[in-house]
Amino acid sequence: QARRREVKQLRETAAVVRHGDAVLVARRRPGEWWEGLWDFPRVTGAAARRGRRLGLVAYSVTHHRIECTVREQVVPRRTKPAAGQRWVKITGLESLAMTAPGRRIAAIAAAPERP
């Protein structure tokens, strides 16, 4: 009988970097889960605590259970994106090949603001 592998718990923070009606998305790099698909950038350190908390997305991938805090970070001007990143209108996200967690984050980002 095969032993079940232990599920590893991970926490991460996704940044919904917003300028006007556009958000910054990043293409998953070779060797990452969902290589080549678009997603919201993950941030660490001080950046992971910056901005308004929009919600939480939980998902599982290959013996990993991940809790992803979603934070909004509004920037005053649209900066040039890094390699593998681009600005997309929030309404244009549905046309991108996105990860499943990325789609859930997009739905949170597109939801009307709550008081």
Identify what each model region corresponds to.
Residues Q1-P115:
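Intrinsically disordered, low-complexity, charged terminal extensions of DNA damage-control enzymes
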